Design a protein with these regions (language model features):
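A conserved mid-domain beta-alpha-beta active-site/ligand-binding segment of alpha/beta enzyme cores
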Residues: 173-258
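Positively charged, amphipathic N-terminal segments that serve as targeting/anchoring signals
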Residues: 1-143, 149-158
Length: 280
């Protein structure tokens, strides 16, 4: 466990708004594009996790939104969710960059918008980055076709950057498609694996909450490590090279706030007071 004051170590505080998080993601994208264009070693297939608003709050309020920060209640389904995500990408993540929104990857690929980033003709190298939103287990087949170059060969170049925003595939692709689609699942496990550095999450801003009700903010900005900040965002309570587990996050937040784990987390209910300990 690492605990340190931001003032002493010049660690940038977490974003205070959703638009602020999207602007930070833009800065990370700039670093990645510059590194890739200069042939500096950097990940080429990456993920960005953008926070999304809760329907009952101001659209720029950065608040706890359930597991992995992606459990907002969207009455309009993935279509509504995509419209909000697209707005953040257009207004902040790609602000100032030469880019073109190409539409949905396929008419059946719900929520999978595609952007080409960068200019120049195909002979001059074409665009250097492709952004895709919301690939999921049910739509990963379309995403695999994109990676294979069926929608354009630029993505197959070794220095082409592919950025996935708010991905939804399970684990390392083992639940893609239908159970009988053995070939698709085998391909997905090879291409979508997040093990050994695959599809590194280069940006994340997520409000977290332990079962005891202690909140904090989890952040990652490539090439920096993962940092978990306390409720007020003035102290780093956990720092790791890899994305911390939910248990690590909860234990760090509870320890910093000097509270115990809620009943049902890793203690028996008979050992706690129902008045003081509530399962959330």
């Amino acid at each position: 466990l690492h605990v340190r004051d931001l003032n002493l170590h010049r660690v940038q505080a977490p974003p205070g708004s959703i638009s602020g998080a999207a602007s930070e993601a833009r800065a990370v994208l700039r670093l990645l594009r510059e590194a890739s264009q200069q042939n500096i070693a950097c990940p080429k297939r990456v993920r960005i996790e953008l926070p999304l608003p809760l329907v009952d709050l101001d659209p720029d309020v950065f608040a706890f939104a359930g597991l992995h920060g992606q459990a907002s209640d969207w009455s309009g389904g993935l279509g509504q969710r995509f419209r909000v995500t697209k707005g953040l990408i257009d207004d902040y993540v790609l602000d100032g960059y030469e880019n073109e929104y190409l539409g949905l990857l396929d008419r059946d690929a719900d929520g999978m918008g595609v952007w080409r980033v960068g200019g120049g003709s195909e002979g001059e190298g074409g665009h250097d980055c492709t952004v895709v939103t919301h690939p999921a287990d049910t739509t990963a087949g379309f995403f695999l076709k994109l990676l294979d170059g069926e929608y354009g060969k630029a993505v197959t170049k070794s220095n082409h950057l592919i950025v996935v925003v708010n991905a939804f595939w399970s684990g390392s692709g083992e639940k893609v498609g239908q159970p009988w689609e053995f070939g698709l699942r085998e391909q997905a496990k090879q291409v979508l694996s997040v093990k050994d550095g695959g599809w590194e999450k280069v940006y994340c801003a997520r409000r977290c909450r332990s079962a005891s009700g202690v909140e904090g903010t989890l952040c990652r900005k490539w090439p920096e490590p993962w940092r978990l900040f306390n409720t007020e965002g003035v102290r780093v309570v956990l720092e790791t090279n890899d994305e911390p587990s939910n248990r690590q996050i909860a234990e760090a937040l509870n320890s910093d706030a000097n509270v115990g784990d809620a009943a049902g987390y890793n203690r028996k209910g008979v050992d706690t007071s129902r008045d003081d300990d509530v399962i959330t």
